[in-house]
C-alpha cells in the first residue's frame, strides 16, 4: 500500500513540476486554472500525510 501511494505521489509531483511552470509562463493560464492546481496541491499534501500515517502504522505493528 505504501508503495502504491508513493508511486502516486511521484506521478503527481512529476505532473506538477511540468505543468505549474508552463501555466505560470503562459499569459492568462494561471488565472484560469488556479483552482485545478490548488486541488492538485491539496491532493499532494494529503498523499504526504497518508504515506506518513501508513508508514507510522505499519512500523508500529
UniProtKB/Swiss-Prot annotation:
Listed PANTHER family: PHOTOSYSTEM II REACTION CENTER PROTEIN Z (PTHR34971:SF2)
InterPro entries found in the cross-reference section: PSII_PsbZ, PSII_PsbZ_sf
NCBIfam families xref list: PS_II_psbZ (TIGR03043)
Gene Ontology annotations of biological process type: photosynthesis; photosystem II stabilization
Species lineage: Eukaryota, Sar, Stramenopiles, Ochrophyta, Bacillariophyta
Residue intervals passing through the bilayer: 5-25, 38-58
Pfam families attached to this UniProt entry: Ycf9
Protein name as annotated: Photosystem II reaction center protein Z
Keyword Thylakoid listed: yes
Organism, scientific name: Skeletonema costatum
Protein's UniProt keywords contain DNA repair: no
Entry superkingdom: Eukaryota
Alphabetical keyword list: Chloroplast, Membrane, Photosynthesis, Photosystem II, Plastid, Reaction center, Thylakoid, Transmembrane, Transmembrane helix
One GO CC term on file: photosystem II reaction center
Cellular location(s): Plastid, Chloroplast thylakoid membrane
Cystine pairings recorded for this chain: none
Record text on subunit structure and interactions: PSII is composed of 1 copy each of membrane proteins PsbA, PsbB, PsbC, PsbD, PsbE, PsbF, PsbH, PsbI, PsbJ, PsbK, PsbL, PsbM, PsbT, PsbX, PsbY, PsbZ, Psb30/Ycf12, at least 3 peripheral proteins of the oxygen-evolving complex and a large number of cofactors. It forms dimeric complexes.
Bilayer disposition of the protein: Multi-pass membrane protein
Similarity-based family: Belongs to the PsbZ family.
Function, in words: May control the interaction of photosystem II (PSII) cores with the light-harvesting antenna, regulates electron flow through the 2 photosystem reaction centers. PSII is a light-driven water plastoquinone oxidoreductase, using light energy to abstract electrons from H(2)O, generating a proton gradient subsequently used for ATP formation.
Amino acid at each position: 500500500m505504501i508503495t502504491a501511494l508513493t508511486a502516486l505521489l511521484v506521478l503527481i509531483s512529476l505532473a506538477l513540476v511540468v505543468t505549474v511552470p508552463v501555466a505560470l509562463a503562459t499569459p492568462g493560464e494561471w488565472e484560469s486554472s488556479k483552482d485545478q492546481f490548488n486541488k492538485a496541491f491539496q491532493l499532494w499534501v494529503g498523499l504526504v500525510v497518508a504515506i506518513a500515517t501508513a508508514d507510522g502504522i505499519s512500523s508500529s505493528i
